[in-house]
A protein has these predicted regions:
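N-terminal helix-loop segment corresponding to the beta1-alpha1 unit
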Residues: 1-190, 289, 368, 375-397
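Mid-domain beta-loop-alpha active-site segment that forms a flexible
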Residues: 167-182, 201-209, 251, 255
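Oxidoreductase and adenylate-handling cofactor-binding alpha/beta cores
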Residues: 174-194, 207, 211-218, 260-267
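Aromatic-enriched alpha-helical interface/lid elements that frame and gate functional surfaces
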Residues: 235-309, 313
Length: 397
């Protein structure tokens, strides 16, 4: 929305959880300025392959969630760095300050809510931590998947626990925080008051365990890994085809009746399979019978057959195939580097803001390390260039 162009976000960020959130805000049209330490910076800048010849801290992994932002380097461990932070918040009229630093660093860096609220009373302050504001335990996505129960639910029953293929606790926490920021912006628009938001990645992760926690704690059921099958519905699984694999998900008894009415699957039209409970009770044999038939069919013909009777089915797409999907390809985001001409292709948001649509789904290229120091500190804050040089030599920026 155009109104998001009036929102300025200052984010002391690194890794994935907070950069993905601010990337979402940049897509909406917010001005996002990422803060990094002038020596260490965001470690994710060094992850993946370097692809811009002769340039450091612009590796491939960093590119995916940092387009549309500006970048400042600032040493908040220095008093002069904290003075600049105060000026940034005040002079740029910052609406949202966000950090995923450990809570023990808040006071040392001068970034605590009370400190920044004193500078701008209506500031919205967001702190993302692994296990809450009282904990300084380091948390990375796989650790959250392990402790948060996701690994216990992922993988084959006879195999080892597995992580899911994307950093779900990271990105899911970002989505939860996004919603909380929208609520805070609305509250501020109505009341004029800012707020403090603390988001725990662990609590975000465990909030998704709706069925597992209820089934375990209320009904004493052991919810565990089941590979590609479903705990409560059958047949639901990946089935082999003559040229690959197909996922079929029969969601209710009516769909199974249509499924078993097909000549190819008529052997499944048994009284004991009429209800889902009977199919679950004999799911191993059921899946073996289905697999014997699907092996003789092409993936395309099987998917076509299932869709014709209202049963959900899909081939197992590669990422390249997903990017070419007609529902995805037109919505991909592009970000072109004006210096080298290199163009990034970025995943689309679930719903594109009108501003993104109006500019042809284009964002500015992910910022280089400290790229906007001069533009922001000199042109907007009025710090003379010779003072900027001194600040750099002193390790402040």
């Amino acid at each position: 929305m155009e109104l998001f162009r009036k929102i300025t976000v200052l984010s002391l960020e690194q890794a994935t959880v907070l950069p993905y959130l601010t990337y979402r805000l940049a897509i909406d049209g917010c001005r996002v300025i990422r803060l990094e330490h002038p020596v260490f910076g965001d470690p994710n800048r060094l992850v993946g392959e370097p692809f811009l010849e002769g340039e450091e801290r612009m590796n491939s992994y960093f590119m995916a969630i940092n387009a549309g932002k500006e970048a400042l380097t600032l040493n908040l461990g220095e008093p002069r760095g904290q003075e600049i932070l105060s000026r940034l918040i005040r002079d740029l009229n910052v609406d949202i300050f966000a950090t995923n630093q450990l809570p023990r660093n808040y006071q040392k860096l001068g970034i605590g809510y009370e400190d920044l609220k004193a500078i701008k009373p209506d500031l919205i302050w967001l702190g993302i931590t692994g296990f809450g504001p009282e904990s300084n335990e380091v948390a990375y996505d796989p650790i959250l998947q392990a402790r948060g129960g996701l690994m216990a639910l992922t993988g084959e029953a006879s195999g080892t626990p597995q992580v899911v293929g994307i950093p779900l606790p990271d990105m899911g926490t970002s989505e939860h925080a996004y919603g909380l920021l929208m609520k805070a912006l609305f509250t501020r628009a109505v009341t004029g008051r800012g707020t403090r938001i603390d988001v725990s990645m662990f609590e975000s992760t465990t909030s998704w365990l709706t069925v597992p926690i209820t089934m375990t704690c209320s009904f004493g059921k052991n919810i565990s890994r089941r590979g590609n099958t479903h705990e409560f519905f059958a047949p639901v699984s990946v089935y082999p085809t003559a040229d690959g694999y197909c996922y079929i998900a029969v969601g209710n008894d009516k769909q199974f009746q249509a499924f078993s009415s097909l000549p190819e699957f008529s052997s499944l039209a048994k009284e004991e399979y009429r209800k889902n409970s009977g199919r679950i009770a004999d799911v191993e044999n059921l899946n073996q019978m289905i697999s014997r038939t699907t092996r003789t069919m092409s993936t395309e013909s099987l998917v076509f057959l299932m869709k014709n009777i209202g049963v959900a089915a899909s081939r197992i797409s590669t990422i390249e195939e997903v990017a070419r999907d007609p529902l995805v390809f037109p919505k991909l985001i592009r970000a072109k580097d004006e210096k080298t001409g290199f163009e990034l292709t970025l995943a689309p948001p679930p719903v594109a803001a009108p501003l993104l649509e109006s500019n042809g789904r284009r964002l500015s290229f992910p910022p280089r390390f400290g790229e906007h120091n001069s533009a922001i500190l000199t042109r907007e804050l009025g710090i003379p260039s010779d003072e900027l040089t001194l600040l750099k030599s002193d390790g402040v920026i």
